[in-house]
Regions:
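Intrinsically disordered, low-complexity regions enriched in small/polar residues
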Residues: 21-23, 55, 121, 186, ...
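Glycine-rich phosphate/diphosphate-binding loop of Rossmann-like nucleotide-binding domains
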Residues: 169-195
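Glycine/serine-rich phosphate-binding loop and adjoining beta1-alpha1 elements at the start
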Residues: 77-176
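Generic detector of bulky aromatic hydrophobic side chains
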Residues: 66-68, 124, 184, 190
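Surface-exposed beta-strand edges and their flanking turn/coil or helix-capping segments
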Residues: 16-19, 67, 109, 127, ...
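A glycine-rich (often HGG/GG-containing) alpha/beta subdomain
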Residues: 1-103
Length: 195
């Protein structure tokens, strides 16, 4: 398996947006067209990353060309910002991504569902053979186990929940009332929540 990754680790947000696939019917058609040309592959596209996992070897050139077409960027620029993983390193990268260990916020919750959705999208269209099925099912099982059996499962973690917590903390420091981070009532400056 090989993986080509364009993420927050290698490209700024404005660049990453050029590789993103929209939601809705338009996005579905774009993903299908992309994957049809990519071959046996899974496409993961989130706000922080676009990654293509392809079965076998020798796919980097083809995937870089497809990503170049998608983004409107030159092949050389795509090569400059893309991270490449092959074989066991590609598998290890997928496991880190699915578990939230390669996220902007380590342990964030959303990525597991996004990986599952990307995998099922390809599997339902017959684009996953034995290798991709085995690797993705293993990564999803591992991520689920980590989420249920480690401290990562003790709190809900995402960029949004952390931002809300920071707003709440800042309002408290300023002596202002703010909506509580759990969404119930207003929190006074002393931290007590009013119903």
């Amino acid at each position: 398996m090989e993986c080509i990754s364009i993420s927050f680790r290698s490209a700024p947000e404005e660049t990453r947006k050029r590789f993103a696939f929209p939601a809705g019917e338009t996005g579905i058609k774009e993903r299908e067209a992309f994957l049809e040309r990519a071959g046996e592959a899974v496409l993961l596209s989130t706000c922080n990353r676009t990654e293509v996992y392809a079965a076998g070897e020798g796919s980097f050139g083809r995937l870089e060309e497809l990503l170049s077409e998608k983004s409107g960027m030159a092949d050389t620029e795509v090569k400059r910002i893309a991270r490449r993983f092959a074989g066991e390193k590609a598998c290890a990268h997928l496991y880190r991504v699915a578990c939230g260990m390669d996220s902007m916020v380590v342990g964030e919750d959303e990525i597991l569902g996004q990986v599952r959705t990307a995998y099922l999208f390809s599997a339902e269209r017959g684009l996953c053979g034995y290798e991709l099925n085995a690797v993705f099912q293993g990564a999803l099982a591992c991520a689920k186990k980590i989420k249920t059996e480690t401290l990562l499962s003790k709190t809900s973690v995402s960029v949004a929940t952390l931002a809300c917590a920071e707003i709440f903390r800042f309002a408290k420091l300023c002596g202002k009332a703010a909506a509580s981070p759990d969404g119930f009532g207003a929190a006074e400056a002393d931290g007590e929540v009013e119903p």
